[in-house]
Amino acid sequence: MSGGSVAFVNLGCRVNRVELDDIAARLEAAGLVPTAPAAADAIVVNSCAVTGEAEAKTRKTVRRMATLAQAPEVIVTGCVASLFASELSGLAPNVTVEADKSLVAGRVISLVGQGGGVPSACEGVTPTGRTRPAIKIQDGCDNRCSYCIVWKARGRGRSLPAVEVLSRLDETCGRGAREVVLTGINIGRYRDGGLDLAGLLDLVMARSDVGRVRIGSIEPPDVTERLVDAMARHGGRVAPFLHVCLQSGSDATLRRMCRAYDTAAYRQVVAYARDRLPKLSLGTDLIVGFPGETEGEFEESLAFCEEMAFSRMHVFRYSRRPGTPAATAPRQVDPREMARRSRRMRELARRMRRSEAERMVGSEQLVLVERAGRGVTGGLFDLHLDPSVPVGSLVRACVRSVLDDASLLGRLS
């Protein structure tokens, strides 16, 4: 059977996007051309099971892809595929489930054949058009947070050997990447023998000429002094940004979540990081409406977030994830109340982001140009600049002003 084109649909986290990029690269090497779902012979869906809503979205997406006019082969992978393979397979006759992502490219080729096309030109380093590619250095999680099922879907924590990290980094830089993100499900637990994440960062800096490295989302206990000191040692070559997952700013809620820290520990981590990294921008994830969250606990969480002065917050309303302790916990919060709390938290997030953006006016920023006239700073702020600056380049720019959406206006230094 002759092959042709393949489309990619990602649902969920950054790690899913990285895994989909790897699959796309293998299929492009086999001659299958990336295209839009409506024109594809095969569609790869990388699924997410982090919440009940995410799982429902996966099922809806698979059904929609399977019923497109050209009746494509739909190959589903990811966390929902690991947990509910038989249910996904039964959605349509042209749906194939492959939980093992290393086998997905082979499955696609077996269904539609190898292609002979020439990849279409697109901006970006990866076949899916991304300019800031990531390397998955770790997978799995050994935590047992009461709202999460990822540990079941992903398995126990395991790390990519450092030599393989360096090999992938060289390959990625060889494709033109100027910034690379180190990511994983729980990257702070990276271990290769005696090498931890701080040691890996030192090794990457010593063995690679990559322009900038960014550390992906990390748990508070893993933001060690060793890691922060390593970031400080390498200056601008490590993005001055940490996404430190909080989930709640109330100690009572954190205990019910079975998180491995309290607000005092979180505060201490942030204080040390800001002392050693004066230009640090701080991001986080935050859940509102967790079972049992009282109005007082929500107010505590709101106040703590304001104290931390996050520049980037992902605010989620709690969504029941069947199979987790939280799903059957007492005192589930009314959805209307969750929506109200979410609005208040998101408004705080907007105010804090704008405040951080205004603080950057007059500063010089290292900017990765992601598309014509638009780049991203080390602190993950969009910056508008001269559209003639080449896409993919890493340049220095002076911040002139803040726009209405809290993006920045700059000019080359």
Roles of regions detected by a PLM:
Residues W151, L254-M257, P325-A329:
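Short acidic, glycine/proline-rich loop/turn micro-motifs
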Residues E293, A309-F310:
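Contiguous mid-protein beta-loop-alpha structural module that forms a pocket-lining wall or clamp
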Residues G184, S217, L246-S248, T284-V288, ...:
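Active-site proximal loops enriched in glycine and acidic residues that flank catalytic Cys/His/Asp
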Residues V244, D285, C305, M313, ...:
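Hydrophobic, well-ordered secondary-structure elements that form the walls
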Residues M1-R189, G193, R226-D229, L242, ...:
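Proteins enriched for Cys/Gly/acidic motifs involved in redox and nucleic-acid/cofactor modification
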Residues T328-S413:
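Terminal RNA-binding accessory module
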Residues V74-I75, L83, G174-E295:
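Conserved SAM/AdoMet-binding glycine-rich loop
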Residues N143, G188, D251-A252, G373, ...:
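Glycine-centered loop/turn positions within well-structured domains
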